[in-house]
Swiss-Prot record:
Top-level taxon of origin: Bacteria
SS bonds (residue pairs): none
Gene Ontology CC: one annotated term: cytoplasm
Protein's recorded name: UPF0235 protein RAF_ORF1191
Matches recorded under InterPro entries: DUF167, YggU-like_sf
Gene3D superfamilies: YggU-like
Coiled-coil ranges per UniProt: none
SMART domains: DUF167
Amino acid sequence: MDKFYNYNSSSHQALLSFKVKPNSKQNLISNFVIINNIPYLKLSIKAIPEQGKANEEIINYLAKEWKLSRSNIEIIKGHTHSLKTILIKNINEDYLNLIINSYIK
């Protein structure tokens, strides 16, 4: 099984894979899900998936949850799909591992 993220140490950037469930009761990252043998972090978002509202809430939630600037978080794949690839810029690998380990149960 592959990892759900890739880290580039020269650019201090990470690509993370998420399975997003919009229109949820709360914003929450809850462990992993495997789809076609590919791992994804599960992300529930309160916003509805209309006119980019859920995508905007994803960025806001991750920025607040991980104490990052919104400008360092970008959805680069899956804008209209529940499977998303998100780019995190200017992140230290140790801090990324700390974040990741908090979701491994």
